Amino acid sequence: MRINPGEIVKVLESKIEGFKEEINLNDVGKVIQVGDGIARAYGLNNVMANEMVEFVETGTIGMAFNLEEDNVGIIILGDYKDIKEGYTVKRLNRIMQVPVGEALLGRVVNPLGEPLDGLGPIDAKEYRDVEVKAPGVIYRKPVDTPLQTGIKLIDALIPIGRGQRELIIGDRQTGKTAIAIDTIINQKGKGVYCIYVAIGQKASAVARLVDKLKQHGAMEYTTVVVASAADNASLQYIAPYAGCAMGEYFMYKGKDALVIYDDLSKHAVAYRQLSLLLRRPPGREAYPGDVFYLHSRLLERAARLDDKYGGGSLTALPIIETQANDISAYIPTNVISITDGQIYLEPSLFYAGQRPAVNIGLSVSRVGGAAQVKAMKKVAGSLKLDLAQYQELETFAQFATELDPATQAQITRGQRLMELMKQEQYSPLEVEEQVAVLYAGINGYLDDLDVEKVRDFEKRFLQYLKENKSELLKQIRETKDLNEELENELRNAIEDYKSEFVKMYGK
C-alpha cells in the first residue's frame, strides 16, 4: 500500500483549519472575610459596580457592592452560612436580571424571581435587568388617564393617574396596606397588571394578603414579590428594583402596570444595614449619603410613555411608615419630595372610626387632577371646598355657643359628607357609583338625614340604582361625563329613592 504524501498534508491542513484553541479566562478572587450577608474578596480586579458574582464552591450568587483598592465588598443574595474564607469567587459579566412577563402573574416569588408558592417552576420567556435608567422627558407624556382606586375619598379628592407616583404615608396600623390592596382589587377587568412588593414584612402577614387577593380573584393579574423579615438585608434591598423591572415589562409592551412598594422605610433600613456593614460613612440618622438616590432612581422609573413609544404606563404607590406622626423625618421628607403627591393617614382619625383615615388637609395629588373623569371633576370640585370649610368651622364651633344658620348648615353638610367618605375595606366602588353617591351628598340631599343613617342610605341607594337605573349608571360609565340630561335623571332618581327611604326607615 502506497501512501500519498499530498493526501496526508491535505488531511493535516483541514484538521489545523478546524482547530480552535479555547482559552477560558475568568476573573476570579478569594474570599478573605464573610459574615452577616457580606463577603470581602481579594482579586476580581476588573469587576464592575453592581456586577453579579458567583461563589464557585456553593453556587451562591452575590453582587459587587463596594469596589475598594485592595478588595471587593460583596452582598450575598442567598444563604451565606456555607461560604467560608478561602472560597473562590468568579465574575459573571452581567448585572442582575429577573424573569418577567405573563408567566409571573398569579405567582408569589422572591426578589430573584424564584417561586415561593409551591406551584412549580416559572416558565419565563424573557428576563430584564433589575437596574435600568428611567425613561427621559422625550419618551414621556403627561398623565391623562385615571387609575381608579375604588375608594371614594381618594378618587374624588386625591385622584391618581396612570404613570403617577403617589406616596401612602402614616403610622403603623393606620390602613396603608389596606388602601394598596383595595386598589389592586379594583383593577379587576381594567387591564392593569399589578405587582405587590413586600419588604421586611412578616411572612404570615403576606400569606394572609395573598389569600385575600385570591378570594377577590385579583391574583389573576397580580405578582407578589416577597423579601420577608426573615430574609437577608441584601434581598430586601433588591426587592423593589426586581418588582419594578417586572412592571416595566408591561409598560414597554404598551400596557398599564401598577407597582406597590410596601414599604420603603424598611427598604432604607436594609440599605443602611448593608452600607454600615461595608463601612460606608454614615450620615443623618446613620443612613448613607446616597439614600435619597436609592429611592429617586427607583421611583423615577414610573412613567406614562408617549404614544410613539407604545403609550404604556407604570404607576408607583410607595408606602412609608412614620414614627409618632413625624413626617419631617429623613426618609419621609425624601420620598415626599420625590413623589407626585401623598395620601397622609392619621391615627387619631383611624381610632375615631373615620376609615380610610386620610387627613384631607395634608394629602395632595399634584398631577392626578388632570386625569380625573369629567363626571368626577364636576362633583369633586365643590366637595373639596365644602370639606375644607367644614374642618375650619368644626374647631371654631366647639367654642361658640350660638351659630348663625349659614354656619350651622355648613357644619351639618360637612358632617354628612365626612360620613359619606367612610368606606369598608375590600369593597371598592365603580366610578359611576361614586359619582351618584357624591352628587347626593354635595347637593344637600342628605342634609336632613341623621348622620347615623347616611351610610345605610348610600348602600341601599346604590342597590336601587343597580336594580332600577342600570342604564343611567352605564351611560355615566361610558360617557365619563354628567351632562344636563344625565344630571336631571340622577337628581330624579335620588329624590324618588329618598322619599322611599324616609317612608321606610325615617330620617
UniProtKB/Swiss-Prot annotation:
The record marks 363 as: Required for activity. It is found in: Cell inner membrane. ATP binds at residues 170-177. It is an enzyme of class 7 (translocase). The keyword Zinc does not apply. GO terms for cellular component: plasma membrane; proton-transporting ATP synthase complex. It is a peripheral membrane protein. Keywords: ATP synthesis, ATP-binding, Cell inner membrane, Cell membrane, CF(1), Hydrogen ion transport, Ion transport, Membrane, Nucleotide-binding, Translocase, Transport. Its EC number is 7.1.2.2. CDD domains: ATP-synt_F1_alpha_C, ATP-synt_F1_alpha_N, F1-ATPase_alpha_CD. PROSITE patterns: ATPASE_ALPHA_BETA (PS00152). It catalyses: ATP + H2O + 4 H(+)(in) = ADP + phosphate + 5 H(+)(out). It comes from the Bacteria. GO terms for molecular function: ADP binding; ATP binding; proton-transporting ATP synthase activity, rotational mechanism. Belongs to the ATPase alpha/beta chains family. Produces ATP from ADP in the presence of a proton gradient across the membrane. The alpha chain is a regulatory subunit. F-type ATPases have 2 components, CF(1) - the catalytic core - and CF(0) - the membrane proton channel. CF(1) has five subunits: alpha(3), beta(3), gamma(1), delta(1), epsilon(1). CF(0) has three main subunits: a(1), b(2) and c(9-12). The alpha and beta chains form an alternating ring which encloses part of the gamma chain. CF(1) is attached to CF(0) by a central stalk formed by the gamma and epsilon chains, while a peripheral stalk is formed by the delta and b chains. This is ATP synthase subunit alpha. It comes from Thermosipho melanesiensis (strain DSM 12029 / CIP 104789 / BI429).
